[in-house]
C-alpha cells in the first residue's frame, strides 16, 4: 500500500489539506464497503497488550483528530490498528475555526492545524459509534472529549462531565483532552489549581457513572509537549492522586523552532509530525521516571517509521498512536509499526 500511496500522495498534496483529508476518508469508506481494503492492506498484526483492564489486539492505535465524528470507524479499523480513538467531541456541535486551518510542511514531514474541535456534537458521534461493526464486535474504541469554545474556562468541568456522561456507555476508554492549542485558554487546565479541580470533578463523576452502569471505564489524560520538568512532575502526581488510568503524551506543539523559515511555518496552530518526535519522547521519559509502573503511557508524536514507534516504547510508552505519519507515509505505516514492536 505504501508503494500505491506514494503514487497517490503527490496528487493529494496538490489539494487543500482539509479537502484531501476528507476525500481520502470517503474513498477509504468506499474501498471498505466493496471489500477492497482487505486486499490492499497487510493483515492485522496480532500482538496483544493488556493495559487498564483492556485487551489491545496490538499496540498501534489511531490518534484522535483523524476521525472527529466517528464517521469512518469501520474503514479505519480495517487498516490493522489495535485500537481507535475518535474525537475530539464536545457536548454541543461547533464549526471550529475559520478555514484555511490546516497546512502541510512537506520539507519537515509536518502539519500545522488550528481546527478548533470542529465536530457534530457528542450525541451524533455516539449514534454513529453504535452503528459501527467495529464497536458491535467489541473493538477497542476510545472517545476523546473536550469543551466547547463558548464555554468559559472556569466552567470547563461541566462540559467534560456532560461529554463523559454521553460517551460512557459506548467507550472502551475516555480521553480528556486539555492540551489542544486551538481552543482559547484550554491549556490553562494543565496548571495545578485548575487541573486539580478538573480531575477531582471527573473522578467524582466517574464514580457516579460506574455505579449507574456497573462498570468502571478507564480515564486517560492527553497532555502537551510544551511542558517543563516541574509541570510534568506535577501532572504525574495529580494523575495518581485522582485515579486517572493512563496518560497520552503528547498533543501538538506550539514551538516553531524546527520549521523556522518554511512556508506556513509561522501559521497559528499545533505543529505535528516529525518535528514533535523528540519533544514527545522527552515528556514520555520524564513521565516514566515519575510514574514508574504505576500508570501506563501512550506515546504519540512524530512516528513516521517502525523505528520511531520502537523509540517511544524505549522511552517508556506501552502503546503508540499514529496520525501525521499516515499522511506522509500511508496506511502501511500501521503494519510497519506493529511488526517493529512485535519484534522488539
Curated annotation (Swiss-Prot):
Topology versus the membrane: Peripheral membrane protein
Cross-referenced Pfam families: DHO_dh (PF01180)
Reaction it catalyzes: (S)-dihydroorotate + a quinone = orotate + a quinol
UniProt protein name: Dihydroorotate dehydrogenase (quinone)
GO terms, biological process: 'de novo' pyrimidine nucleobase biosynthetic process; 'de novo' UMP biosynthetic process
GO cellular component assignments: cytoplasm; plasma membrane
Assembly and oligomerization: Monomer.
Transmembrane segments: none
N-terminal signal peptide: none
Entry binding sites for FMN: 64-68, 88, 144, 177, 222, 250, 273, 302, 323-324
Keyword terms: Cell membrane, Flavoprotein, FMN, Membrane, Oxidoreductase, Pyrimidine biosynthesis
Amino acid at each position: 500500500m505504501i508503494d500505491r500511496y506514494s503514487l497517490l500522495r503527490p496528487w493529494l498534496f496538490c489539494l487543500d489539506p482539509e479537502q484531501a483529508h476528507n476525500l481520502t476518508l470517503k474513498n477509504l469508506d468506499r474501498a471498505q464497503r466493496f471489500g477492497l481494503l482487505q486486499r490492499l492492506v497487510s493483515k492485522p498484526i496480532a500482538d496483544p497488550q493488556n493495559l487498564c483492564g483492556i485487551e489491545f489486539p496490538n499496540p498501534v492505535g489511531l490518534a484522535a483528530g483523524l476521525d472527529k465524528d466517528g464517521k469512518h470507524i469501520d474503514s479505519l479499523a480495517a487498516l490493522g490498528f489495535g485500537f481507535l480513538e475518535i474525537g475530539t467531541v464536545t457536548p454541543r456541535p461547533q464549526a471550529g475555526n475559520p478555514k484555511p486551518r490546516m497546512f502541510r510542511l512537506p520539507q519537515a514531514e509536518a502539519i500545522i492545524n488550528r481546527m478548533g474541535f470542529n465536530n457534530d456534537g457528542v450525541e451524533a458521534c455516539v449514534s454513529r459509534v453504535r452503528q459501527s461493526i467495529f464497536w458491535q464486535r467489541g473493538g477497542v474504541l476510545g472517545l476523546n472529549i473536550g469543551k466547547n469554545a463558548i464555554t468559559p474556562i472556569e466552567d470547563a468541568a461541566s462540559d467534560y462531565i456532560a461529554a463523559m456522561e454521553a460517551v460512557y456507555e459506548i467507550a472502551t476508554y475516555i480521553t480528556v483532552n486539555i492540551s489542544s492549542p486551538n481552543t482559547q485558554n484550554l491549556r490553562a487546565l494543565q496548571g495545578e489549581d485548575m487541573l486539580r479541580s478538573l480531575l477531582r470533578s471527573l473522578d467524582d463523576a466517574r464514580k457516579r457513572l460506574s455505579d449507574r452502569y456497573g462498570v468502571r471505564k478507564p480515564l486517560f489524560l492527553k497532555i502537551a509537549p510544551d511542558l517543563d520538568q516541574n509541570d510534568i512532575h506535577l501532572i504525574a502526581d495529580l494523575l495518581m492522586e485522582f485515579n486517572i488510568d493512563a496518560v497520552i503524551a503528547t498533543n501538538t506543539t506550539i514551538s516553531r523552532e524546527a520549521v523556522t523559515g518554511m512556508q506556513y511555518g509561522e501559521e497559528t496552530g499545533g505543529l505535528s509530525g516529525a518535528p514533535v518526535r523528540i519533544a514527545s519522547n522527552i515528556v514520555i521519559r520524564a513521565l516514566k521516571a515519575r510514574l514508574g509502573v504505576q500508570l501506563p503511557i501512550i506515546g504519540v508524536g512524530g512516528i513516521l517509521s517502525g523505528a520511531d514507534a520502537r523509540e517511544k516504547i524505549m522511552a517508556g510508552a506501552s502503546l503508540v498512536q499514529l496520525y501525521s505519519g499516515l499522511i506522509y507515509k500511508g496506511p502501511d505505516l500501521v503494519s510497519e509499526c506493529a511488526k517493529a514492536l512485535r519484534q522488539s
